[in-house]
């Protein structure tokens, strides 16, 4: 049974299982979706991404969850909370990634807001972050609508590329 973590008006956020690999692959292997990661993932990278989420569920009790449309039961993306390195600490980050055809419909904001409430009320974090590539304006707008403000500018080295990022934060 797939554990449902959060429910909103239109969405369920639930732990993923290996049976979600098909839906996850179609998202992570889409160049349009993955432009902030410097390109689509290979099959190997997609499987490693899934394994990382499954391990996060075991280690922390949270991670990136599958975003499911209640009306159709379709997995349309991922949203959740992960621990990410920022400066010299691990901080809780709200992350989101949706299939291209579901962009600009309010789903990312709806899921991110639910994660913010979960992070504060259930996980008892005092601060939540979103670390977003500087070119990813749509995700920056989601962070702002989620009550976050930009607090820093960092460079992350990922896939052999230096990628500037903006750090957003909201306090409880």
What are these regions (language model features)?
Residues 1-34, 68-172:
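Acyl-donor (CoA/ACP) binding surface of acyl/acetyltransferases
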Residues 32-52:
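Conserved GNAT-fold acetyl-CoA-binding loop/helix
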